A protein has these predicted regions:
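Well-ordered beta-sheet/strand-loop patches within structured domains
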Residues: 1-224
Length: 224
């Protein structure tokens, strides 16, 4: 049991968390330089992985497919501990360097604010059950360098806005459990991000430029 997205809202459901596994596997395969056959982004940015490295799976219609186009087989090794999943692709030593670059487009889409009547809550009580997230459009690149050759791939992703949802009491008194409040902070993401997997190591290097969307308070500054 973990959170799933249903009708635009996060709820607990059977099979929840599969996208976390898919996103982690996609990121590992991406930095290994594997061929991307089929991958779709989430319907909203995720807090557990960088925007642009996430992946969605929904049985049986949406899948994640990567192809090992390396000249050697690989082993998928996964570790789970303290609520953290780590996936490694193990194979022969490679001299390739892989860089992920993400740029957030300047125009973002405003999110809706919805009020949902709740007869279990007393009149006048309001509970924020889902914090809104604006809609983003991003361009992402993968640059693979090996010896004197560099190959660049380019994709575009769109994340629709996530509605902000308030549960609004309409009853005479509290007659049920209070809905869980969404305590997540405002969503921020660096407008420019570059992550490089260095050749032959597990070391990653990051270059960040916050831009308009990477610092707290950006939604107010952007009039959202």
């Amino acid at each position: 049991m973990a959170t799933v997205i249903s009708a635009g809202e996060l709820i607990d459901g059977v099979g929840g968390g599969t996208c976390q596994i898919a996103g982690t596997l996609f990121a590992a395969s991406f930095f290994a330089g594997m061929e991307v056959l089929d991958r779709r982004p989430h319907t909203r940015p995720s807090g557990y992985i960088k925007m642009g490295l996430d992946a969605t799976v929904v049985y049986p219609s949406i899948n994640l497919r990567m192809r090992n186009n390396l000249p050697f087989p690989v082993v998928i090794h996964r570790r789970i501990g303290n609520g953290v999943l780590r996936i490694e692709l193990l194979g022969a030593r490679s001299e390739r360097t892989v860089t992920f670059v993400r740029k957030i487009m300047p125009r973002v889409d405003r999110f809706e604010e919805l009020s949902v009547p709740d007869a279990n809550l007393p009149a006048g009580m309001r509970v924020l059950t889902q914090r809104g997230i604006p809609g983003f459009r991003i361009t992402r690149y993968r640059i693979i360098r090996e010896n004197d050759v560099a190959v660049r791939e380019r994709w575009q992703d769109a994340y629709p806005p996530t509605s902000q949802i308030w549960r609004v009491g309409t009853g005479a008194a509290l007659t049920g459990p209070i809905p869980r409040q969404d305590d997540h902070p405002e969503y921020t993401a660096d407008q420019y991000l570059a992550v490089t997997q260095l050749a032959g190591t597990n070391e990653m290097q990051e270059v960040r430029r916050p831009g308009f969307s990477g610092a707290a308070g950006w939604m107010v500054r952007e009039g959202l």
